[in-house]
Amino acid sequence: MSVKSTFRNGSAFPLALLFMLAAVLACSSGSAKKCTATLTLGGLTFVGEDAAEEKATRNACNKYCREADPGYEAMYGVWLDSPAGKAAGRPSKEEAIFKDKKLMDYVTVTCANECLAKIKDGKGKVETKCD
């Protein structure tokens, strides 16, 4: 059977579909790595997840910053009462970082770096497990 006749009788389409299905299954069959970091800081526990161990730890720090950092609490309170906070509909502490760049930078850069430094200094403890 020549290539020309294969395309004429329509059997090439199911064959191509079969190859595509095999490629999709091959690419998606491996389970993605998942790391979970459990941070204990100030007597409270925060969990962060990511495929990378370092990012899981940073995500746990970000969660600490949003939920328990006094600096973020103060910034959020001031912003919430500002015209920008009112215009944004007075969002939650978690949502506010997506509405204001300064809040986002404080959580993900300033506070997160301080949190990582506390871990390094032994003031905070993090346990990370990757599957």
Positions of the model-derived regions?
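Post-signal/leader-peptide non-cytosolic segments of secretory proteins
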Residues: K33-D131
